[in-house]
Amino acid sequence: MEYLSSNKIAIIDLGASKTIQKELDEDLVKEKIGGAGITTALYEEYRDEDPIVLGTGLLTGTLAPASALGMVTAKSPVTGKICHAPFTLYGGVELKYCGFDYVVIKGSSPKPVYLWIHDGIADVNDGKEIWGKDVWISTDMIREVMGDPLIQILAIGKAGESESDFAQVCINYWASGDRWGFGKLFGQKKLKLVAMRGMSLLEIADPEGFVRKCKEFLSTIKSGPYAGKGGIGELSAAMGEDIRQWLEPIIHRHLSCFNTPFPTNTFVFLDEDPKLLKETEKKEPGFLITDVHGLLGYKKLGLSAAEACDLLRDCAKYGIDAVAVAELSQKAGKKKPDEIKKSLSGLKGSLESVGKGKFSPWAPSFTLSSDEWERRQAVAYLFGIHPIYALMSPEFSEEKLIELANLGTGLGFTSETLDKVIIDILK
Amino acid sequence: MGIKVDPKKCVSCMACELACGYHRDDGFALLSSCIMVTRGREKKDYSAVVLKEEENLVIARPEGLEIRKLGSTGEASSGREKEDASAKPLLLREPCDLCGDREEGPLCLQFCPVNAISMN
């Protein structure tokens, strides 16, 4: 695969602690496009070895608006189905640039390990120093050891190590869109984290045509209904559960994922003045909210915004899905932050908020029907478009994405190709 | 004439960095950009936009702008370690040429989704 690609797949055998590399076959891309199309195909190829597949979409890491998406594809311990969980911020782009479009992690390690994927190399390293540490400390330790604060990390905390059904694979210090208990899978495989860093160059079949078209799309988006807006509060308002006033006093600023026109994340300061402009002296002043559902769950318990965000921070450190914690706390009648914090270890119960399909319910449905939501998610996960942003920008249509994919790769995708792949991955 | 950055509008999406990288490399890469969003202080939510010009290093921080003459004292430490946590330090890259070969002007400006970049 020559364009928009690193042209490599890493196959990592945790049991044997060995990695092999394969080329990304252009015929596979022609048939499956990318992203969830190819992670699903790779899952099926290695199905007998209980794989976790990491991947990026065809347009991830390009100037296509919102091309931020990376994904984890595996069998969910929660639903028993093959599901896809998103990782955004700078994780998707870092995976694309680290030299592999896809990473298959198969088998289990007898001892704690972590993966260090960088510049076309994938190493299995001893993880005994970080096993037992929370997500924040683990991320800090890896970045310090490697001497690079820009390493992007998919990590589990103690929830994953103890194989909780609600364990989440976090991204750096923050919650991800993993609602499938993939953190438990990491824990079962004794895989503490995946560290990614790379400096690849992605070539483009028609560079100027591709960039011109990206610019046109961005121009349309910039005059759309979300122009000038941002943050988790706006998402909640679009969902009909407006928390903007409740959250406002602690907001430091809103942050985008890679090349995403709408900032879907909000950083709140809990131990610092939110209006501070200069660099704080505090090492850990707050939290980046990346999941609106967890926040809404704690608000429903009657907590203040600061209490809710403090709990989100604890959940991320522990590596547990805050949505599950909020729902189970509600059911158990726990409404005080301290008692909720104490319940993280050994949390059990059944959830009603579990996604029923292939794609994480992390992306709100807004006003879409379930069929419309699912198709739009499928498109996002194939092309590598931020799954929330894909729902917010219908003007970024399937036809436009296909046009971009063809300018980028020269492979001649059609709407028939897309329909076929979507049917395949929704099976 | 030069590029002006409003860091209070910036959402740290890196579109400017990738657009600049494309201008340099005719492909998508981040190692040659002369504009970058510093992301090394993630837990503190503190970042700046740094631009290498022909003679200056421009650091647009939320609390204000700093312009350092290239070659001045202190440039190396701040340019390499604090503002610029990258594999290829900004000071080793080509300075901004305002995308002089492009009729529509600088690509970073055109790709900023929140209009944080403008021409001085």
Regions found by a protein language model. Name each.
Chain A
Residues 13, 19, 28-31, 68, ...:
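Extended C-terminal regions of large enzymes
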Residues 1-179, 183, 188, 192-201, ...:
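Protein-protein interaction/assembly regions in multi-subunit complexes
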